[in-house]
Regions:
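Residue position within the beta-strands of beta-propeller blades
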Residues: 74-80, 131-133, 175-178, 222-226, ...
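Structural motif
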Residues: 82-96, 138-145, 183-190, 231-249, ...
Length: 392
């Protein structure tokens, strides 16, 4: 096959997996296999002649722990087949909240969604509202919806051709990582609930991909992972290294102040989350969409990276640390297994616990921890939206 054909194929794969940190997980039976392998050495990648790495500033580690008065809630997003067997009758978004006391998942929201939607979502527990991406059956793009969990009232808040990758509700404000109409890349945006409009980080920028959008409670800023769409398409990246040079940064709520924390093109970073004052955890692959997805630990001050393997786990797809700095919730694949499950892991004792659902999900989509003035106990039952109406 000619080199130009190879490059074209790789570019198509990159565009399809550009937001791969949030790829949904099919749950095959034990006979299936979702393992990917690679015999290429990612550490051999070298910067192109004349290419400069971004200069990283001196990093001041924030002092003190986040507000302990906030309620920490683990939310897990799944998509299930409505008929229980296949997608012929459509799919539904199901949001689970995990109760630590009873050690059980509880459904707090369920609704049919469009077949082509990535169902990014978040919950405002104080006002009992779910915000989520969905679409009408004939649409191949996303829009933002809200559902009042007290009344079941649903509102469509936007009317455009969007692609949502993340939704966050922080300090009473709704944030999104979204690619708007006529744009390729996702970028952070703040949503005004009164005017129902987005304020984007930089509307003129359709080159910078923003991945792994999360709120860093230690820095009181957002943690973001960025790379260049143009650089992703270069011969060096698409045909030689197969690694997108990426930068982990902090960005404040105004989107005006950005602090780079770490840069690499030695391996592919998929997802990042702050563990404690001086540590960031990240899932990585040797190259783009190649090899097992494993966990690494970054020391922010020293810039040293080390493996953070979890005994008994062969892949960590997505994760969220607790504010206690010791507990890790993640979607992973146990050694010798092909099923993806949700686990809780204690870093100090290495105690690993599988969290079980009332019914096994068809696809696990996302895992998120929120910190708000109240949690699921504030809700009055769960909200189930169906064609014939609302059931409480």
């Amino acid at each position: 096959m000619k080199a130009k054909q190879l490059i074209s194929i790789l570019l198509m794969l990159l565009l399809l997996t550009a937001c791969s940190a949030n790829t949904d997980l099919d749950l095959p039976d034990e006979a299936g296999s979702s393992e990917q392998t690679s015999n290429m050495d990612a550490s051999a990648a070298e910067p192109e002649d004349g290419a400069e790495k971004p200069t990283l500033p001196e990093i001041e580690t924030p002092e003190g722990a986040p507000d302990a008065e906030l309620v920490e809630t683990l939310l897990v997003t799944v998509v299930d087949n409505i008929n229980g067997e296949n997608t012929d009758d459509g799919v539904e978004l199901v949001i689970y909240a995990y109760d630590e006391q009873s050690q059980a998942f509880r459904v707090i929201f369920k609704t049919p969604i469009g077949p082509y939607v990535y169902p990014a979502n978040t919950v405002d527990f104080e006002h009992q509202i779910v915000y989520y991406a969905s679409a009408r059956p004939d649409e191949t793009y996303d829009n933002l919806y809200s559902c009042d969990l007290k009344t079941g009232n649903v509102q469509r808040l936007t009317d455009g051709k969007n692609a949502f990758n993340d939704l966050l509700f922080v300090d009473g404000t709704l944030y999104a990582n979204v690619a708007r109409e006529f744009c390729t890349t996702c970028q952070p945006a703040r949503f005004d609930l009164d005017s129902q409009t987005f304020t984007y980080r930089n509307e003129a920028d359709d080159d910078t991909w923003h991945h792994s959008f999360s709120y860093d409670d230690y820095a009181d800023e957002f943690l973001i992972l960025t790379c260049s769409d143009a650089e992703m398409r270069t011969h060096r990246v698409a045909a030689e290294t197969h690694i997108r040079p990426k930068t982990i940064s902090l960005i404040d709520a105004t989107f005006e102040n950005v602090t780079p924390l770490f840069f690499t093109e030695d391996f592919e970073i998929c997802l990042t989350r702050r563990l404690n004052e001086n540590t960031i955890l990240m899932t990585t692959e040797p190259q783009m969409v190649s090899g097992k997805r494993t966990l690494k630990r970054l020391d922010i001050t020293s810039q040293e990276v080390e493996n953070a393997a979890i005994p008994g786990i062969q892949q960590v797809h997505m994760f969220y640390p607790s504010l206690d700095g010791n507990t890790l919730y993640f979607v992973g694949q146990a050694e010798g297994k092909t099923i993806w499950n949700v686990y809780r892991y204690a870093l100090d004792t290495q105690e690993l616990t599988q969290l079980t659902f009332p019914k096994q999900p068809d696809r696990i989509i996302d895992i998120q921890i929120t910190h708000q003035p109240c949690g699921p106990d504030f809700l009055h039952g769960c909200c189930v939206l169906e064609d014939e109406g609302l059931k409480k």
